[in-house]
Amino acid sequence: MPKTDWNFSKQGYIDVPGGRIWYGVVSGGNAGATPLLAIHGGPGMSHDYLYPLVDLADERPIVFYDQLDAGLSDRPNDPANWRIERFLSEIDVVREYLDLKTLSIFGNSWGGTLAAAYTSSHPKGIEKLILSSPLLNTDRWITDNRFYRESLPIDVQKVMVDCEVAGQTNSQAYEDAVDVFYRRHFCRSDPWPGYVTDTFEALNNKCYAGMWGPNEFTCTGVLRGYDGTAALSSIEVPTLMTFGEHDEAAPASCREYALAIPSVSCA
């Protein structure tokens, strides 16, 4: 179970194509309000790092779930499951199982990929959408993060290049260098909060590598070449696009994506 005290009012497992996925609901008493479905990033990460959303539970139920091959869910690690369409189908199953006829959706990073794609194609019953530093175009993401990489200390960049040339991207030296990047552009708190370390400890590297790649600035997996921007104009619900100054989803890119959404605010 998660190390952070979540105080779930309800949790369990749901059968989906490929296995079982875990879900948990946090509710502060306002059960009649429109629930918020939280979709985590990765791929292969867990719901843990989304813990700050619990602060909203006094206003509405917050529904968390771990995608297949992530967190507390089953991990068949079958590449046949690593398709966007299958992950979108999980949202339908969660909605049906928990009777979420009306809801709002929050998606972060890869979760934003799913949230945007789902809302544009399954708008019925969705009141509002929050896209938090979303991955919407892989090539743009790689370009932005390679720019960030070039801003790292020269010695850190040299370790990365030397390890990549030598085929030693699994080495401790390379992991330490990438950690410098993550501490600038994934989470800048020092030390990292427990709910962030919980997520990294639960990371399914097989799923992450198979769908994305070895790190945030190299994509060799299923999402290589992905572009979901064409669907943004089909999002009909009020949308909030959030991003931070140092986010891997660079502010300039997020502002550009927002221009395509008919009813959007940025924060």
What function would you assign to each model-found segment?
Residues 2-20:
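N-terminal cap/lid segment of alpha/beta-hydrolase-fold proteins
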Residues 63-110:
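Active-site loop/oxyanion-hole signature of alpha/beta-hydrolase fold enzymes
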Residues 139-204:
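Helix-rich cap/lid subdomain of alpha/beta-hydrolase
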Residues 235, 241-243:
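Short beta-strand/loop motif that positions the catalytic acidic residue
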Residues 17-76, 80:
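Conserved HGGG/HGGXW glycine-rich cap/lid loop of the alpha/beta-hydrolase fold
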Residues 248-253:
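Conserved alpha/beta-hydrolase "acid-adjacent" motif
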